Amino acid sequence: MAESSKVFKKSSGDGKLAIYLAKRDYVDHVDHVEPVDGMIIIDPEYQKDKKVFVTLACTFRYGRDDHELIGLSFKKELCFLHCQVYPPLPEDKKPLTPLQEKLSKKLGVNAFPFCFNMTTDLPCSVTLQPGPEDTGKKCGVDFEVKGFWADNVEEKISRKNSVQLIIRKVQFAPEATGTASCVQTTRQFMMSDKPLQVEVSLDKEVYYHGEPVGIKLKINNNTSKIVKKIKITVEQLTDVVLYSLDKYTKIVCCEEINETVAANANFSGSYSLTPLLANNKEKRGLALDGKLKHGDTNLASSTILRPGMDKEVLGMLVSYKVRVSLVVARGGILGDLTSSDVSVELPFTLMHPKPSPDQTNIEDVVIEEFARQKLQGAEGEDDKDDA
């Protein structure tokens, strides 16, 4: 039996246009990004006296819709690519990709190709989780492919006469990883001849979503004080670098260890924490991977930067760290009044594993059409988000 590949289809409200894409996720390999190639079917009626365009836009939204009603716009277009697919322009003619060749044979003479090449300095798809009472479009970065007919590409477009699909730009974990993180710190206290030594290490550098983070802790308490509390947290850091220098730190998982370390004593232990969105569903401002409405999402993946890359064009940068905090105090009833905090931080990378390469020798395509439907709890979302 011949092998087949799924192709995604979305039609305009009036049924006159339909866009076909081979995928919804396009991989940023750091040094290049996969091209966005597809086909658009144009009703013969539209081919008489109309121009048809396809665009790819990357937009960073950093404010709510209701602010736009009073004349304030809290969104910035980071990239806008466009091409006129009908009538086709001779200077834009390019060889068909393997996908386009197969779709051209399947769809017939009313199908026209388009292809966009994104630059490597665009951010990946990411969104900030709204609070329970928030409505409207979510803050974050999204990518939209749109097809429409107009006299020119800047004309105001009717949603009925256009078709939009949300796609995602994603990164996957690198195949080659560095050594596991290990950090040591020493704290000298008054009235103690010797210091407190803390060593924290992770079992590896890169973790996949849903995978536990393994942490080893060693404490050499050579002081006259007592380690009264030990707390381990996994924190997500989001730098909003496009319009401000805002930095958001969110604890995504935490464990308090019921252990004390007496004066002149040692302690060691191994712990495991798993950062999951399921445990942080109502945490406002948490960064998530860009969401396609028909699928679930997860905590945002770590941002991987190309050496020398300008961070400010990326909109939002996401990173993770493990923090181990100790509360050190003197013994006795009044000891807590003079307590000190000792903290150790270790960065790590949280990403999806790289999937198996796409098959290029497929013999047929299977078309999956997207229904226009609203999901529960998505009131106020634009229709394009259902794509």
From Swiss-Prot:
GO MF, one annotated term: G protein-coupled receptor binding
Cell membrane listed as a keyword: no
Domain of life per record: Eukaryota
Pfam family, one: Arrestin_N
A GO biological-process term: G protein-coupled receptor internalization
Tissue expression notes: Retina and pineal gland.
InterPro entries: Arrestin, Arrestin-like_C, Arrestin-like_N, Arrestin_C-like, Arrestin_CS, Arrestin_N, Ig_E-set
Keyword field contains Transport: no
Alphabetical keyword list: Sensory transduction, Vision
SMART domains according to UniProt: Arrestin_C (SM01017)
PANTHER family in alphabetical order: ARRESTIN, ARRESTIN-C
Protein family per UniProt: Belongs to the arrestin family.
Function description: May play a role in an as yet undefined retina-specific signal transduction. Could bind to photoactivated-phosphorylated red/green opsins.
Protein name: Arrestin-C
Organism lineage string: Eukaryota, Metazoa, Chordata, Craniata, Vertebrata
